Swiss-Prot record:
Main location class: membrane
Gene responsible for this protein: ALMT8
Keywords: Ion channel, Ion transport, Membrane, Transmembrane, Transmembrane helix, Transport
GO term, biological process aspect, one: monoatomic ion transmembrane transport
Pfam families (UniProt xref): ALMT (PF11744)
Lineage top rank: taxon: Eukaryota
Protein name listed in UniProt: Aluminum-activated malate transporter 8
Membrane topology according to the record: Multi-pass membrane protein
Keyword Ubl conjugation: no
Function summary: Malate transporter.
Entry GO terms, CC: membrane
InterPro entries: ALMT (IPR020966)
Transmembrane segments annotated in the record for this chain: 45-64, 66-86, 101-121, 127-147, 160-180, 189-209
Length: 488
């Protein structure tokens, strides 16, 4: 008994002795987690400081005596507005600020009107009329929140409308200064909302539209990364490291990105024109592209199942389809990288994308030829090659899906006014033309051959661009369709 008591006592003192070191380790671990969280997105720290600035500015309604005399305790509504309205992005702040401002204005006006209307029915009829109006408008506003469009863009405004109307209408029954109360509430909310919007826009703004733009381009890059590493994943899995394998599977995050994309697109519509994005930028087109990207990610997820499966086709069959499969995955990956770069830089590079897609289609034809030449002779052979054939068919679907993504981006680029990238063929001709002008070129004039000695050598170069009909731009740059030069 004494031994157990001594052991418990020793254990207690040991825990007490270890407590400072454990506390230090725990605090250090938490500090490192906070530092890592802040480094992942430094804008979070800036946003926190911006909220602090907005709260400090709006608190002047209490600190400055003339402002306090004007607004009194209703200045608290301005502080409350800053807390609930200030969002991480400019679009989020504008959405909540404008919703709150207009909802307060409309609900306040209706509330004052409801109070004056109810007073016509006398002291006994006034609460009955107010109760009917509060019930009717409150129920109607609540029902409107179920409509998808209102739910998506004006849900917060409908909520504030219900709150403000009920507050003004019910308070008006016990006070005669209903107009003053409504004015002070509206004024302080507008002051708080305006401060939020100004701080959000002019101090290190975070644009939802820019985040959406980068997100779509990065998601397309994730698809490209997987397709470029597909050959090694499927045909040579033993040579792929764990880090590389996890890197190429980044596409999995695309499968759960729909809610984030919808939210960013909705907030981006509230934002004014900024940077490369004009006032009426086609934000809805991002959702169309995102849907196709997600569809492609679903195909890759199915494809990844065959990569991880132990049920593979015979080695002889895989060796026949390896070359077209490799070409197909590599080319379609390059096409996706070009599309992602086009979105990031907002430059239309259709020639490069078309070239890679055409190459992938040629690889599909070669794959079909290889499959026909490997037609199984027996039922058993057919069962053995099914995994390989299924994998190939899914990869063909991926190519078709990438082509749809490109078509959607091509449509989007016209609406978003992407800059045109100079065609590669025209660029080569321009470079050759400029090179000729830098060298020593002596033109051949009529009659020169008669004057000069017959032993002199001339090389007459006549350039006919037969296979290429120059556009108006090409003619302006190159000067003419036919060039005659003499190299001495």
């Amino acid at each position: 008994m004494d031994l157990n008591a001594q052991e418990k006592k020793a254990g207690f003192f040991q825990r007490l002795q270890d407590f400072p070191s454990k506390l230090k380790d725990d605090v250090t671990k938490r500090v490192k987690n906070v530092q890592k969280f802040a480094k992942d997105d430094p804008r979070r720290i800036i946003h926190s400081m911006k909220v602090g600035v907005a709260l400090t500015l709006v608190s002047l309604l209490y600190y400055v005596r003339p402002l306090y005399i004007s607004f009194g305790v209703t200045g608290m509504w301005a502080i409350l507005t800053v807390v609930v309205v200030f969002e991480f992005t400019v679009g989020g702040t504008l959405s909540k600020g404008l919703n709150r401002g207009f909802a307060t204005l409309i609900a306040g006006a209706l509330g004052v009107g409801a109070v004056h209307l109810a007073r016509f029915f006398g002291h006994q009829g006034e609460p009955i009329v107010l109760g009917i109006l509060v019930f009717s408008l409150g129920a109607a506003a609540t029902f409107s929140r179920f409509f998808p469009r209102i739910k998506q863009r004006y849900d917060y405004g409908a909520l504030i409308f219900i709150l403000t109307f009920s507050f003004v209408a019910i308070s008006g029954y016990r006070t005669d200064e209903i107009l003053i109360m409504a004015y002070q509430r509206l004024s302080t909310i507008l002051i708080g909302g305006t401060i939020c919007i100004l701080v959000s826009i002019f101090i290190c703004p975070v644009w939802a539209g820019e985040d959406l733009h980068k997100m779509i381009a990065n998601n397309i890059n994730k698809l490209a990364k997987y397709l470029e590493g597909f050959e090694g994943e499927y045909f040579q899995p033993e040579k792929i490291s764990k880090e590389t394998s996890s890197c190429v599977r980044e596409y999995k995050s695309i499968l759960t990105s729909k809610s984030t994309e919808d939210s960013l697109a909705n907030l981006a519509r509230w934002e004014p024109g900024h940077g490369r994005f004009r006032l009426r930028h086609p934000w809805k087109k991002y959702l169309k592209i995102a849907g196709l990207v997600r569809q492609c990610a679903v195909h890759l997820e199915i494809l990844n199942g065959y990569v991880l499966s132990n049920d593979k086709a015979p080695q002889e069959f895989e060796s026949k389809i390896q070359e077209p499969i490799t070409t197909m995955s590599r080319e379609v990956g390059e096409a996706l990288k070009a599309i992602a770069k086009s979105i990031k830089t907002m430059r239309n590079d259709s020639a490069c994308v078309n070239a890679h897609i055409d190459n992938s289609k040629k690889a599909i034809k070669n794959l079909k030829i290889a499959l026909k030449s490997s037609y199984p002779e027996t039922y058993k052979d057919l069962l053995e090659i099914i995994p390989g054939v299924t994998m190939a068919s899914i990869l063909i679907e991926v190519v078709n899906c990438v082509e749809k993504i490109y078509e959607a981006v091509e449509e989007f680029s016209g609406l978003a006014h992407f800059k045109e990238t100079l065609d590669s063929k025209l660029s080569a001709e321009i470079g050759q033309h400029q090179l000729l002008h830098r060298g020593c070129v002596k033109p051949v004039l009529d009659g020169d051959n008669e004057k000069e000695d017959n032993s002199s050598c001339h090389v007459l170069i006549t350039v006919h661009d037969e296979g290429y009909l120059p556009t108006a731009t090409a003619k302006n740059v190159l000067g003419a369709e036919k060039t005659r030069v003499d190299i001495v």
